[in-house]
Amino acid sequence: MDGLDTEQIPEVLPGIALSSEQWAALQAIEAFLQSQSKLYLLTGYAGTGKTTLLHALISRLRQQGDSRSVVLSAFSNKATKVLRTMAAQWSLDVDCMTCCKLLGLKPVIDTATGDQLFETVNDQLNQVPHYRLVVVDECSMVNQEMWKLLVNAVSRLDIATQMLFVGDPAQLPPVNELQSCCFEQIIHSSALNQVIRYGGAIGVIADDIRRNIERSQLPTYRSDVSTDQTEGFFIMPRDRWQSLLIRAFTSAKYRDNPDQVRVLAYTNRRVKQLNQLIRTAIYGAQISDYVVGERLITNTPCLDEEAVLLQTSEECEVIGIKRGKVENLPVWLLEVCTEAGDCRDLVVLQQPALPDFQQRLDSYAKTLQWELFWAFRQRFHDVNYAYSLTVHKSQGSTFQDVFVDLPNLMRNPK
């Protein structure tokens, strides 16, 4: 199949020619869909055409009169948002939802450890049996617990559902895990290795980094941009980098589209510095802690008794601000709007309350009162500004312009 002339490959998508590698993977997945197997894995790094292949797969099924129900799913809300946008753009007749919603789960916090677990809300809310094909994208994010839940759901003998996992094993793994189980335990698979999505410099540098991910240090890069300077990457001194960064965040484009630009760094400390720098440039030095219209990102799950208001790394926009007191501590009562358009009420500690908050947590910990520890901690919501993100939190996102703090990124010892 590797030697197949591309002229022999039929046109599945108008104006898009599949490579011989993509065509081979497409045929392998189609064979899987006609088999009794339950699991299949498609791997490939950025630019190898995984998304195009998914588009081709669903389009070809419909062209052949196959009306099987399909759902696109991902572990995070952020990655699911990308899938939903893609499906709408291509007019695909599919559903899109998070893995939690698909399985009828709700995230809960173990009061003894503080770990996030998944709990079945109602077996009847498990939607896996309603679909013939479940596609789990960005599967590098799927941790061991979610992997078991997905496999158990699709392994029922009374349903014909099959599950296609899609991802890149070189992406960041789940927290406290070396690699997602998806890449270790699925027998049938196809791999895309040829970069085809990018025709310019970004594709070249991404391909180089991905292929040489084990080297001890990066080579010296030089700016490489298109003739009209609209695509590519720029290497510049910090002062110039910072000046352009400020210009980008104070532009009309960013005001109209919060996904227009982001800054990526490695350490939380550097992210905090960059967020303060950008806020000051936009609003001035005397600005309040929160401003209507600002974009926030959660550091941990935001809970309200038994309900999860926002997942970790979920973004939202501030639409209302009040002052208040909770547990005799001064707080910000924030009304926010999620990316799905839902309104949520968050309780965020004001800066003067932080020492007292930490002291009370330490007291509970010293006396081993863990249920009180977690109950008190969960009364308040931990959020950050979303101008700058760590590379880990940015995974699964799509931004138009990205500023990368390379010196800070190189502090990663791995």
PLM-predicted stretches and their roles:
Residues G15-L33:
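N-terminal pre-P-loop "Q-motif" helix
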Residues Q27, S37, T43-R60, Q64-V70, ...:
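Conserved helicase motor core of SF1/SF2 NTP-dependent helicases
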Residues G114-V128:
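Conserved alpha-helical scaffold flanking the Walker A/P-loop in AAA+ ATPase domains
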Residues L333-K414:
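C-terminal accessory regions
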Residues Q22, S76, G199, T267, ...:
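Short, conserved phosphate/pyrophosphate- and ester-handling motifs at nucleotide-, phospho-/glycolipid
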Residues M1-I16:
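Charged, amphipathic alpha-helical linker segments immediately N-terminal to NTP-binding catalytic cores
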Residues L4-T6, A28-K38, K50, A170-Q351:
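Conserved helicase motor core of P-loop NTPases
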